[in-house]
Amino acid sequence: MELENIVANTVLLKAREGGGGKRKGKSKKWKEILKFPHISQCEDLRRTIDRDYYSLCDKQPIGRLLFRQFCETRPGLECYIQFLDLVAEYEITPDENLGAKGKEIMTKYLTPKSPVFIAQVGQDLVSQTEKKLLQSPCKELFSACAQSVHDYLKGDPFHEYLDSMYFDRFLQWKWLERQPVTKNTFRQYRVLGKGGFGEVCACQVRATGKMYACKRLEKKRIKKRKGESMALNEKQILEKVNSQFVVNLAYAYETKDALCLVLTIMNGGDLKFHIYNMGNPGFEEERALFYAAEILCGLEDLHRENTVYRDLKPENILLDDYGHIRISDLGLAVKIPEGDLIRGRVGTVGYMAPEVLNNQRYGLSPDYWGLGCLIYEMIEGQSPFRGRKEKVKREEVDRRVLETEEVYSSKFSEEAKSICNMLLTKDSKQRLGCQEEGAAEVKRHPFFRNMNFKRLEAGMLDPPFVPDPRAVYCKDVLDIEQFSTVKGVNLDHTDDDFYSKFSTGSVPIPWQNEMIETECFKELNVFGPNGTLSPDLNRSQPPEPPKKGLFHRLFRRQHQSNSKSSPTPKTSCNHRINSNHINSNSTGSS
């Protein structure tokens, strides 16, 4: 039994390390899998793609890189890209250096005498920006200037880009992105845990070598529990939220027996494990603060989509290889209709907000209560309304949430005590974060006084703890309880509409990020010499014929050999014998 677990872990660790070869986990045929189509095959895509500047040139990672390459080949446009880069750099500059960095931008790009002066930013706006820089520089100082540059770029430069070989190449990448996804797209590894409808296992994309977690939802189990809307809801929310602090959905596909969500893999274990199984319960405040800041950023990204998470607890916060966290398991998350409130008594005992327990209507407020519970538990080493391993009825825990105040030990600084107290306010209208400003109000609390959120969001701050890369932070394979067989449920054609809505293939932004991170983009995104067209982009050059299979090559070679033979009856007989022999062998090996 122990041997089986060791083997499963060893295979997984080798895959995580890239297999130990030069291809870093990529298939031998990865270039064939990601071979660009001839541009003539992309005409339908060209006609139907949404020609929105922000979508094509800013939001989509490969689109952004290709538009950048286009601008760098136009001397008059290169300075605009450099300006936007410097503004992005300014926004993550430490506060004490903002003044100097701001002056650098003003001098280089917003001074008329400069050789790279950007005239598209109006003089009135330049004057206002300069005045603010002298008074009190802030992170958003150049936002309006950057918007002016985007307003210019989305005009003539964008339309020129749409007629360039760089946009043609983008269409080729989109064609690859939209290819069917099946179980053969991946290699499967050990089971990592269980979800509500099936197992979660590690997997690896054959073409790129990138590791993911595959959440299998068994079709019969979904149907038996009438979980179709819940499963589709989670998939659609994951698809829309693009956040480095929430697990990303990269692929959604189906097999004969299951629906599969391919998600960011988090190899560092969950917060519950780290709070209770790594020395004394709880964290030092500095570590708790870092995780709280990243959780807050994840909530902010969800709330931006008007989505309330409703299940904040340590088990649902996962660590990656580097020690950064992501919110996982969006099964209870729900999108709130614009201008409306919802009702629903869902969540985990001890973490549900008073308004949820009382079945009142609510918006985003339960998530700020959940954040308060998490900060408290990370510092204290137990949840605010239930002792560690305390045996107590659900009704008693609910009563404590509604009627009692949490107790603070000497582990809490004044700032930590204050933020927990304000987040755990029982009246949601008075709770921190539940006013118009939302997460921005929480970020301004003194607890986060020394946290640079711009640098955090840019991934520039080092986590306080890095997981051991040689460890597998999950239960032994045989300790993960297996699901029983679902009986008495039959799948039929009436389920197909649901499956088609679920199985939509690759998700654009995560897929494009995968191509960039695994260096597939760098290696494949090659044009002709001196900025000329590559053969696959040349409309006057016909596409290469598809490669013939082994059987075709063998048969053709035999046919050519026989054509050279003398047409005597004896040779003709030998021809028939040889031809049959070749066919027999070919069929046997196919």
UniProtKB/Swiss-Prot annotation:
Name the CDD domains on file: STKc_GRK5
Q: Which residues bind ATP?
A: L192, G193, K194, G195, G196, F197, G198, E199, V200, K215
- Residue ranges for the region (Interaction with calmodulin) are 20-39
Q: Where is this motif: Nuclear localization signal?
A: 388-395
Source domain of life is Eukaryota
Domain Protein kinase stretches: 186-448
In residue numbers, the region (N-terminal) covers 1-185
Q: Which GO terms describe its biological process?
A: apoptotic process; fat cell differentiation; negative regulation of apoptotic process; positive regulation of cell population proliferation; protein autophosphorylation; regulation of cell cycle; tachykinin receptor signaling pathway; Wnt signaling pathway
Which residues in this protein are found as Phosphothreonine? T485
Is Phosphoprotein set as a keyword in this record? yes
Q: What broad class of enzyme is this?
A: transferase
Please give the residue ranges the record annotates as the region Disordered.
557-590
| All residue ranges annotated as the AGC-kinase C-terminal domain in the record | 449-514
Q: How is its activity regulated?
A: Inhibited by calmodulin with an IC(50) of 50 nM. Calmodulin inhibits GRK5 association with receptor and phospholipid.
Q: What happens when the gene is disrupted?
A: No obvious phenotype due to the redundancy of GRK subtypes in the regulation of GPCR signaling. Deficient mice are viable and showed no anatomic or behavioral abnormalities, only a slight decrease in body temperature. However deficient mice shown altered central and lung M2 muscarinic receptor regulation, with normal heart M2 receptor regulation. GRK5 deficiency leads to a reduced hippocampal acetylcholine release and cholinergic hypofunction by selective impairment of desensitization of presynaptic M2/M4 autoreceptors and promotes amyloid-beta accumulation.
The subcellular location is: Cytoplasm; Nucleus; Cell membrane
The record's PANTHER family line, in alphabetical order, gives:
G PROTEIN-COUPLED RECEPTOR KINASE 5, G PROTEIN-COUPLED RECEPTOR KINASE/RIBOSOMAL PROTEIN S6 KINASE
Q: Which family does it belong to?
A: Belongs to the protein kinase superfamily. AGC Ser/Thr protein kinase family. GPRK subfamily.
Q: Report the protein name in the record.
A: G protein-coupled receptor kinase 5
